[in-house]
UniProtKB/Swiss-Prot annotation:
Transmembrane segments: none annotated. Mg(2+) binds at D245, E286, D313. Catalyzes the reversible conversion of 2-phosphoglycerate (2-PG) into phosphoenolpyruvate (PEP). It is essential for the degradation of carbohydrates via glycolysis. (2R)-2-phosphoglycerate binds at Q167, K338, R367, S368, K389. This is Enolase. It comes from Synechococcus sp. (strain WH7803). The gene is eno.
């Protein structure tokens, strides 16, 4: 038996560390009375939605203005005194105390990066205090579903210095019998793709998320991915499909979308996406239209919502208010879940719950500025989300999440269920 006093928060410390892009980020450690502790590091995005929670940066010359000493100080000087003495088991109370202390709508007082670091570290400390893995602590005995990975193997847009407008072209190995086999399938296609790009004289340098960043058009990227799937010995659309992150807010201005040398209004943009769905085995499209183009999104949902998964990232920013607006207007059918968009674990879980109750899927996601923290791997299993998006098959901050999912699958043994094997995850009309 555990002593409840052992699970009381005793000390909280924080430090400035680096993310995968060499930018500062916040790490927090929560230590409990009984000696257990938890550590977490927050990620950071490149293409950020205008409605995301506020990430506090120092400004000035240090680290080119990207330092996070203010956020670190807020943890140690303001958050720690407010939380010490609370039970780490009451995650909702811990997060509520920080939100009350912050007092703003977008966490701009303390910084979402300060609040989230403590929120995630607290959950891990509580799990460690109970002797439970994080996925089991958060998800209970039903946390046995391993997610279908959406593997970003070709990077463009804000994630790479190339000519590709769309931000991510992903492999979706939904036809695998297990997560381990899905990872193998994706990895084999990744290496096959590298050989194809090299043979065509294209760059095999990788972008922020570990995918290749060749100079291609959007159609060419789809064509070479299908070729790589086939050459690796798999059937496009049956075993491995494609997913896109258009990140269209990045090339939207004055009511028009400018990409691949053309300029399109919302209806024309929807038409362009329809053509791609007809041409390729695409099962999921993220941010197909800009974050505040609600009318365009409604049209996209009417035209493609019954055929493919339409994921709102910048549209919803893991925010229940914006998600409810989408639900009420039948806009999109899926939400991308990024813990640092909303800034606390409790609010993240609330967004996933609202999505599930409303018939929307959830895709647990990393950010382009990642770290070795593997919380989102456990979160994907804990919430039975059935999908995870955590980059390519290179760069250790991406692979860390895949390796954690392998460990979880092994630990679950015969209880483990791969979402793709039971018809969950994106399947589209492939």
């Amino acid at each position: 038996m555990f002593d409840s006093l052992d699970l009381v928060i005793d000390t909280i410390v924080a430090r400035e560390v680096l993310d995968s892009r060499g930018n500062p980020t916040v790490e927090a450690e929560v230590l409990l009375e009984g000696g257990a502790s938890g550590r977490a590091i927050v990620p950071s995005g490149a293409s950020t939605g205008a409605h995301e929670a506020h990430e506090l940066r120092d400004g000035g010359d240090r680290y080119m203005g990207k330092g996070v000493i203010q956020a670190v100080n807020h943890i140690e000087e303001r958050i720690a005194p407010a939380l010490c003495g609370l039970s780490a088991l009451d995650q909702a109370a811990v997060d509520a105390a920080m939100l009350e202390l912050d007092g703003s709508d977008n966490k701009s007082s303390l910084g979402a990066n300060a609040i989230l670091a403590v929120s995630m570290a607290n959950a891990r400390a509580a799990a460690n205090g109970l002797g439970l893995p994080l996925y089991r602590y958060l998800g209970g005995p039903m946390a046995t579903l391993l997610p279908v990975p959406l593997m970003n193997v070709i990077n463009g847009g804000a994630h790479a210095a190339n000519s590709l407008d769309f931000q991510e072209f992903m492999l979706v190995p939904h036809g695998a019998p297990s997560f381990r086999e899905a990872l193998r399938m994706g990895t084999e296609v990744f290496h096959t793709l590298k050989k194809l790009l090299s043979a065509k004289g294209m760059s095999t340098a990788v972008g922020d998320e570990g995918g290749f960043a060749p100079d291609l058009g959007n159609v060419e990227a789809g064509e070479i991915l299908v070729e790589a799937i086939e050459k690796a010995g798999y059937k496009p659309g049956e075993q491995i499909s494609l997913a896109l992150d258009v990140a269209s807010t990045e090339f939207f201005a004055d009511g028009r979308y400018a990409f691949d040398g053309g300029s399109y209004d919302s209806a024309e943009m929807v038409g362009q996406l329809e053509k791609l769905v007809e041409q390729f085995p695409i099962v999921s499209i993220e941010d197909g239209l800009a974050e505040d183009d609600w009318e365009g999104w409604k049209l996209l949902t009417e035209r493609l919502g019954s055929k493919v998964q339409l994921v709102g990232d910048d549209l919803f920013v893991t925010n229940t208010k914006r998600l409810q607006q989408g639900i009420d207007s039948s806009t999109a059918n899926s939400i991308l879940i990024k813990v640092n968009q909303i800034g606390s674990l409790t609010e993240t879980l609330q967004a996933i719950d609202l999505a599930g109750r409303s018939g929307y899927t959830s895709v647990i996601s990393h950010r382009s500025g990642e770290t070795e923290d593997t919380t989102i791997a456990d979160l994907s299993v804990a919430t039975r989300a059935g999908q995870i998006k955590t980059g390519s098959l290179s760069r250790s901050e991406r692979v860390a999440k895949y390796n954690q999912l392998l460990r979880i699958e092994d630990e679950l043994g015969s209880q483990a269920v791969y979402a793709g094997a039971v018809g969950q995850g994106p399947r589209g009309n492939a």
